[in-house]
Amino acid sequence: MEFVKNNVKLIDLAEPGRKIEYAGRVCYKSQDKISDDSYERFIKGIINSGHTSVLEHERKMFAIPVNVFSEKDYEAMFEFEPYFNLTVNMNENPSYFFVSGNIRAWYELLYGPKEIIYHAEADTLKNFLHKDYPYIFEIDENRTPEDVGILYGENAENVCDDLSKHKSYTFEIVGSRSFTHQIVRHRSLSFSQESQRYCNYSGNKFNHSIRFIKSESVDENVLKVIEGAYFKAIENGAKPEEARQILPNCAASTIVVTGTLDDWKKFLHLRVDPHAQKEIREIAETIMSYLRLTKADIGLK
């Protein structure tokens, strides 16, 4: 048995695909398998298995001249709210329609069951995304989209005055299961969490030990009994997904959480409040400190 403290870490992995792999491997506690070229194979695997929620931890933005897409295309994008964030700067020359979405949203928009983008500009979006994620966004090498002035990534960010709806931040958080039950209620955020279904805490990877968040209200002897019962269940042939049923809410869990600055501001508004539960309030205060270090305008004192 091991007692651990709450912990928050800002995940800043700039190379495309790296953050997706890291978040996905947290679910299985397989970060030890990360290598220089492991992310492509890992991401292909999660797409093939249908577990595309992990793709939500990276986000890409386009600046599209307002005359490029038809009204039908804009309506199709808005239909996917809140998966895409859309803003416009009609007072500038040129005027841009800014649209950002996580990689899962772009993948499902451009390769989903419905044909949502109706003309050749879809190829332009695919080509940009293909440069960063060739193993996700396939393109027709024989087609060369017309240059219609669409900007992508940092080039798009550089012409946008307000990135609060477009720029995302990712945190790796260690907290109790009580905490994770609360944070996942913030539905605009994206989550990848340590899976008690797949993690076998009786194994060597976990030092034959279950982590708990220390609580003065919980008797340590009770936790020892619970840990022993878990290990006994595994020894008797139970799968981790069965043995986990007896684990308490103070069991520690690692969760990776991603959201735009606007998403985090809404979270902080509710969770740094004195009336918020103590654990999530303290974690929210740490997140707020990290965001301030990035010079983000969070609008809170």
Language-model region placement:
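Family-specific signature for flavin-dependent thymidylate synthase
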Residues: M1-K301
